[in-house]
């Protein structure tokens, strides 16, 4: 596994090719008993599918993480690149009880398949893309786990496809993106 920083995606030919011409799987992690991971599959810059992975409920975090691992392993396709939410360190300090299981979930997702590249993207980065494509910006974003996973994939594509900088005008977005579904 090669971890790629979002700011370095254009310098990594393998990761850049994976995003623009290969299969990308994006996962919005979940760890709580009531939440499920969102996912998005994108092939050569075209959104193929996105939704929620139904993970069986479990009594302990260990069993929940095992169920997340098995669900990712069994239900998601192999991919050239995994995009996952990068949980900022200050979240861990501010919300330790909810953030630790979320970080564990990220590790379990990364270990579930032999992803050649992993692109962790912080929420502030993909929210900046939300602000560029959603009318009314983040206030009108319909925040759901599957939409968050979709935005992770859209952000990976946007960072890779837009040279040299991501600008609102003439923004290249993946095909098959229905922005209307992301609006409240």
Task: Give residue spans per PLM region.
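Phosphate- and other anionic-substrate recognition elements at nucleic-acid/protein interfaces
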Residues: 1-184
């Amino acid at each position: 596994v090669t971890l790629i920083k979002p700011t370095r995606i254009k310098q990594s030919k393998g990761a850049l090719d994976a995003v623009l011409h290969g299969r990308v799987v994006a996962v919005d992690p979940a760890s709580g008993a009531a939440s499920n991971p969102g996912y998005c599959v994108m092939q050569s810059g075209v959104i193929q599918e996105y939704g929620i992975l139904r993970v069986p409920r479990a009594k302990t975090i260990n069993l929940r993480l095992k169920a997340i691992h098995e669900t990712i392993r069994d239900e998601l396709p192999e991919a050239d690149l995994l995009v996952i939410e990068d949980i900022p360190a200050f979240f861990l300090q501010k919300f330790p009880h909810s953030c630790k299981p979320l970080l564990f979930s990220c590790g379990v997702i990364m270990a579930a398949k032999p992803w050649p590249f992993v692109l962790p993207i912080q929420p502030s980065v993909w929210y900046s893309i939300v602000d560029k494509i959603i009318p009314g910006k983040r206030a009108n974003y319909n925040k759901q786990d599957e939409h968050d996973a979709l935005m992770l994939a859209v952000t990976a594509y946007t960072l890779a496809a837009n040279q040299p900088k991501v600008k609102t005008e003439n923004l290249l977005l993946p095909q098959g993106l229905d922005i209307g579904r992301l609006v409240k």
